[in-house]
């Protein structure tokens, strides 16, 4: 009675345990760090003289390429995070259902007249499976919370910083004067700082 549900709890708990969220986040952080370093390495002059205009435009173009690679990377990582979050959500739902059914079976057995050692042991096993289910539900929730933090940080960069950066990039490409170059440099720093903030929080 309830053996198939208990087995499902064991199987799903094992799947959750083996889902390597750490490896996923380590890969994401490694790629973001590399992208941030490349963007940071771009040297944007404040106001290039006419003789340096072509070189400045080359640097602006390079900054644009590095940023687009970073944006593509951020978007790609979001997709991977959403997949992991959906998997945890699905597994958590199954565990929650199993927990309710096992609790119901345990209560049924406990209210019966049969108080033999076999029945009592069975009740104990059912309750243990409920405990295991709740433990892994908590684990799944914790990992989902961490993934949501990454999503929030990445979305903030994509939604708040990237549009400003692209606008500044166009302005600087059309007119690499002091004001436009200064704004571009400020936004480049804001972009790399935002990504490094994500990395810093992710490492805690």
Regions found by a protein language model. Give the residues of each.
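Long amphipathic all-alpha helical oligomerization modules
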Residues: 103-204
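Leu/Val/Ala/Ile-rich N-terminal alpha-helices, chiefly Sec-type signal peptides and the beginnings
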Residues: 1-92, 99
């Amino acid at each position: 009675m309830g053996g198939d549900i208990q087995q499902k709890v064991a199987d799903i708990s094992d799947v959750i345990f083996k889902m390597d969220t750490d490896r996923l986040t380590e890969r994401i952080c490694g790629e973001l760090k590399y992208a941030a370093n490349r963007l940071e390495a771009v040297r944007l002059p404040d106001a290039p003289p006419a003789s340096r205009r072509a070189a400045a435009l080359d640097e602006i173009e390079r900054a644009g390429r590095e940023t687009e690679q970073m944006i593509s990377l951020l978007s790609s990582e979001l997709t991977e995070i959403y997949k992991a979050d959906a998997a945890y959500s699905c597994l958590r739902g199954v565990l929650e259902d199993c927990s309710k059914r096992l609790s119901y079976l345990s209560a049924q057995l406990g209210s019966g007249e049969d108080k033999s050692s076999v029945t009592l042991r069975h009740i104990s096993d059912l309750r243990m499976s409920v405990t295991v289910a709740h433990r892994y539900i908590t684990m799944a929730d914790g990992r989902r919370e961490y993934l949501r933090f990454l999503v929030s940080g990445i979305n903030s960069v994509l939604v708040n910083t990237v549009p400003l950066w692209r606008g500044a990039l166009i302005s600087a490409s059309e007119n690499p004067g002091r004001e436009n170059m200064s704004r571009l440099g400020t936004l480049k720093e804001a972009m790399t700082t935002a990504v490094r903030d994500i990395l810093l929080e992710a490492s805690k």
